[in-house]
Swiss-Prot record:
PANTHER family assigned to the protein according to its UniProt record, in alphabetical order: AMPLIFIED IN BREAST CANCER 2-RELATED, NONSENSE-MEDIATED MRNA DECAY FACTOR SMG8
Region (Disordered), start-end ranges: 627-702
Protein keywords: Nonsense-mediated mRNA decay
Organism for this UniProt entry: Drosophila mojavensis
Compositional bias per record (Polar residues), positions renumbered to this chain: 686-702
Name the UniProt record assigns to this protein: Nonsense-mediated mRNA decay factor SMG8
Protein family: Belongs to the SMG8 family.
Residue stretches of biased makeup (Low complexity): 643-666
Keyword Ligase assigned: no
Length: 967
């Protein structure tokens, strides 16, 4: 012990001399446990008892230091826990996770285990606090301790102790007594006076607060068997250290000593000081009290001397030694002794068993026991002590129930992802009314899973998007051959006479073909009209497929060069691959047909711009019988051909003829369209040369072309699509709905003929076109072979004045139809029809979408759906070549030979309802952009052309002139 008056050691390493001294006490050993908070580096809470550990002591969690003063009956156990700042700092340094809640509850769980041990092995437990007021969190700790003791410890500890030699000593309560709880506060409030009355008053006030809190939360009860701790009756159990400085600040003391040394008072007092002192009313005025004054109040000195933690503790130790430990603490006492003192040896045996069961086995992961209650204590105690987690989880469960209920109550029978997301957002708001804490994210994830499972349980909508961007409303789990979005549009048929209700299309075929074919059955006009037959895909095998553009384009592009002579040294691999892909290959060694086709192409004086897959060929023989409306006989191969693209009245025409461009350029006028006539003998020679290489039964239009019979074009034909691919069905429609007389410019389009037009927007625009014909030059013109009629036209001139009626029709989803008088203006009756209105219309780009002028809460977009053309009664044919630019694609009719519109007839060209490129759907815009009306698509200007009508008189000579209207 050396200079110290006490012994200290680490449990269980008790020194032999101390063991012999404790053995002399027999059954009069009182064990006092000291636990609580500390701020020192050694985690010492024994400073109030004037005891300290060794200087080399290192604190650790769960470490127990024993203190014993010889001559006393008190064995003090100092518990080092996570409530000590030194131990807590060690745990923080070793912490790797940033989850503070998890760290905090683990630190609290360790403290609860150590305090649980103290309550089972000690007679008196002193809780030390560094604060000046009572820490109410201790009440929570006591609640946890009571829960653990009643729900876990009492279920296994008495039974397992009875299996050892200490079971009879501790009894059914598994502890020597209900320990008396004392509270020691190391610091006294600075603003309180340190007199006996004030200190006692403050201690009594704190005792009342502690007593009421422990009573309120059933920590302290009247029954000794159910009470966790005991409090003495009519005896002080709260101690405030008001006089001693337990943890002095060494630096502050050094600074104070330095100031005292440097400011020594003078030994002699000056005369002036003596004069001032003589004026004092009494001795000691304006001077500090000396030692004599401090010794005057002996009662205060005695109180200060006796008011120590050791004296405070010994009063309770004496109660334990005298057998008054439980008297006054409980109103209900059992007949069996509630308190018993053990010898040092017996207590050490009990301590070893309880320490092993409560502390040691917890850290042993390999420990196995058959006692299920003890196994639950070892594995589940930490979770059961995490009451914050239980609290937050309970709130999250309440919020989860509320959120799920809100979701299910508002959920319809069948709904899609947008509705699901909105319902989930509403359920989240309902959850947040109750859910709180760190487990909100987990609860929200569970809420999302529950709602998703509820949605997928027969309530999920198919949600296959239509070509207009609307989801399918049918149940996903139920088999359905046809999708349906529940949205119905009003649309007209090909001829425009009949309107019907169309469902939102989900395939390109439904949008551009099937609906119009179904409506044509109900339309009296559609079944009678003559239609232009567009080139379509004809399969040669049963397992034909859509073209894969990424893989097929190299072969498709390579196949375009097969008409050119092959380069010497090339292998036959490409030819073999092409033979498999296409059913009708043309070898590169046979260029003769190509040259003859080129000869036919050169016969036109003013060709239109290049269209899909070939040069423009205006030969009337290339159109077949489907376009010879109003003619009684087939086209003669010897007839001349002329063609040109119609230009505006202010734009000069440009001749592209090989032989006569220089001769006719000077003759072109500013306001006329010049057409160069081809001599019949030249055309006849070219036709005969072509017939030598082709079968006699085939015309120019029916010649075999390079088209695939195994792969088809999945989308619409556009300028960049391969010429070898054809679509499965036509997305366009061109029909002659009757003679030109069915349209009256005075009344416009009548409802019985074209239904759904808005008032004033049902007029076609007149278009005056002036044409001048250039006859071929002959060295010896065979005038003797001309008829009289042709000679009269020849003499009267070669000018034509054509009046064409054109209308650009737009149609909205409500079935409203209207014409446009300019790219940015809807036709408003006859007042909007001016002389140059149509010229400005056809020579400018037209927007593909335009706002419908119909009144409604929602603004509907109308789409360019039809072009109305009333052809003139003149010996010319109108040629249509529409090009619709949507995004990066420019869509065309996909015809190698452009269609001719017959004379004096009413023609309607119906545009596709939906545009689709190479496997890329082009959705309509959500709204119209006035600043850029062509952003969503446009019809390019210059879609009309003109060609001379072929004569039906096969007896006429090649040099006979054509019949035409004079200017």
């Amino acid at each position: 012990m050396s200079s110290k008056s006490y012994y200290t050691w680490k449990y269980p390493d008790i020194p032999e001399n101390v063991e012999s001294m404790l053995a002399e006490l027999n059954n009069s050993l009182v064990v006092v446990g000291v636990i609580g908070r500390s701020r020192g580096p050694q985690a010492n809470k024994m400073s109030a008892f004037d005891m300290r550990p060794n200087k080399l002591h290192e604190p650790a969690d769960g470490q127990i230091l024993c203190y014993y003063k010889p001559g006393t009956n008190t064995l003090m156990l100092h518990f080092e826990t996570t409530y000590d700042e030194a131990v807590l700092s060690q745990q923080l340094l070793s912490q790797t996770s940033i989850d503070f809640d998890n760290f905090y509850y683990r630190m609290r769980s360790r403290f609860v285990r150590n305090m649980l041990l103290a309550l089972h092995v000690c007679h008196i437990v002193v809780y030390v606090d560094t604060a000046e007021i009572f820490d109410t969190t201790l009440v929570t700790i006591c609640q946890l301790l009571k829960y653990v003791r009643e729900q876990h410890v009492l279920e296994f500890l008495p039974q397992m102790l009875h299996e050892t030699s200490v079971g009879l000593m501790l009894g059914d309560r598994a502890r020597p007594c209900t320990p008396r709880m004392l509270f020691l506060f190391e610091n006294y409030p600075r603003d309180e006076e340190k007199t006996r009355d004030h200190i006692s008053s403050y201690e009594f006030k704190t005792e009342d607060q502690i007593y009421h809190l422990l009573r309120q939360y059933n920590i302290l009860t009247n029954n000794v068997n159910t009470s966790l701790v005991a409090l003495p009756n009519n005896k002080q159990f709260v101690f405030y250290n008001a006089h001693e400085e337990l943890h002095p600040d060494q630096l502050s003391h050094a600074i104070e000593a330095l100031n005292t040394t440097m400011n020594k008072p003078d030994a002699k007092e000056e005369d002036e000081d003596l004069d001032i002192i003589s004026l004092a009313p009494f001795e000691g005025f304006v001077k500090p009290f000396g030692a004599d004054y401090k010794t005057r109040d002996s009662k205060e000195l005695d109180y200060k001397k006796n008011h120590t933690a050791w004296h405070f503790l010994q009063r309770h130790v004496q109660d334990a030694l005298q057998g008054y430990f439980d008297e006054g603490s409980f109103k209900l006492l059992t007949q069996t002794p509630q308190y018993q003192l053990l010898s040092a040896r017996d207590w050490h045996s009990c301590m070893a068993e309880i320490y092993r069961l409560l502390i040691q086995n917890v850290h042993d992961a390999n420990y196995v026991t058959d006692n299920t209650n003890y196994q639950a204590y070892l594995r589940e105690l930490n979770e059961s002590l995490n009451y914050e987690k239980k609290f937050w989880c309970h709130l999250c469960e309440l919020g989860l129930k509320k959120g799920v209920s809100a979701y299910r109550n508002a959920a319809p029978a069948i709904y899609g992802s947008a509705t699901h997301n909105q319902l989930l957002a509403d359920a989240t708001l309902a959850f947040e009314e109750e859910g709180r804490g760190p487990y909100v994210e987990m609860a929200l994830a569970k809420l999302s899973d529950v709602c998703l499972k509820y949605w997928h349980d027969g309530r999920q909508q198919c949600e296959q998007l239509s070509l207009r961007g609307h989801p399918c409303t049918l149940p996903k789990d139920l088999a359905h051959d046809k999708h349906s979005s529940g949205i119905v549009h009003i649309s007209s048929c090909n001829c425009g006479r009949t309107q019907g209700r169309r469902e939102d299309p989900f395939t390109l075929r439904q949008a551009n073909y099937d609906y119009y074919e179904q409506l044509a059955v109900m339309c009296n006009l559609c079944v009678k009209v003559k239609k232009f037959q567009f080139p379509l895909f004809t399969p040669s095998i049963s397992d034909y497929r859509a073209a894969a553009f990424e893989a097929a384009f190299p072969l498709l592009l390579a196949s375009k060069n097969r008409l050119e002579p092959a380069v010497q040294g090339d292998s036959d691999l490409d030819a073999e691959a092409a033979d498999e892909l296409y059913s009708q290959p043309i070898k590169a060694a046979e260029p003769a047909p190509q040259k003859q086709l080129q000869t036919l192409g050169d016969c036109c004086s003013q060709p239109l711009s290049a269209t899909y897959g070939s040069d423009l060929n205006m030969s009337i023989a290339g159109f077949g019988d489907s376009l010879n409306e109003g003619e009684d006989a087939d086209a003669d191969a010897d007839s001349p051909e002329i063609r040109s693209q119609i230009c505006s009245s202010g734009q000069s025409s440009r001749s592209r003829s090989n032989s006569s461009s220089s001769d006719t350029s000077s003759a072109n006028t500013e306001n006329e369209l010049v057409l160069q006539l081809k001599e019949r003998s030249d055309q006849k020679n070219a036709t005969e040369a072509l017939s030598e290489s082709c079968p006699e039964s085939q015309s120019v239009a029916s010649m075999p072309e390079l088209v695939s019979t195994t792969e088809y074009l999945p989308g619409l034909v556009h300028m960049c699509s391969a010429c070898e691919l054809l679509p499965l069905f036509p997305s366009w429609s061109l029909a002659c709905v009757g003679p030109s007389s069915i349209y009256s410019h005075n009344t416009g389009l009548q409802e019985h003929f074209q239904s759904g037009f808005l008032s004033g927007a049902n007029f076609l625009l007149p278009w005056d076109v002036h044409v001048r014909l250039l006859q071929p030059h002959h060295k010896h013109p065979p005038l003797q072979q001309m008829g009289k009629k042709n000679q009269r036209y020849r003499k009267q001139g070669d000018r034509l004045a054509l009046k064409i009626f054109v209308g650009f029709e737009y149609e909205c989803s409500r079935g409203h139809r209207f014409m446009m008088c300019s790219p940015d203006r809807v036709l408003r009756g006859g007042a909007d029809i001016e002389r140059d209105t149509c010229s400005k219309l056809v020579n400018n780009n037209m927007p593909l979408y335009f706002p419908c002028p119909c009144r409604g809460q929602v603004s509907f977009l109308a789409q360019l759906m039809r072009i109305h053309v009333v052809t003139p009664k003149a010996p010319v044919n109108i040629i249509v070549d529409p090009k619709v630019r949507v995004g990066k694609y420019t869509f065309t009719l996909g015809c190698t030979v452009l269609p001719r519109l017959s004379q004096s007839a009413y023609w309607i060209l119906r545009f596709p309802y939906v545009y689709q490129g190479d496997n890329v759907l082009i959705a309509p815009p959500a709204k119209f952009e006035p600043d850029d009306p062509f952003a969503s698509g446009c019809l390019l200007a210059g879609m009309f052309g003109i060609a001379e009508t072929d004569t039906t008189d096969a007896i006429q000579s090649a040099g006979a002139p054509l019949n035409f209207t004079r200017l």
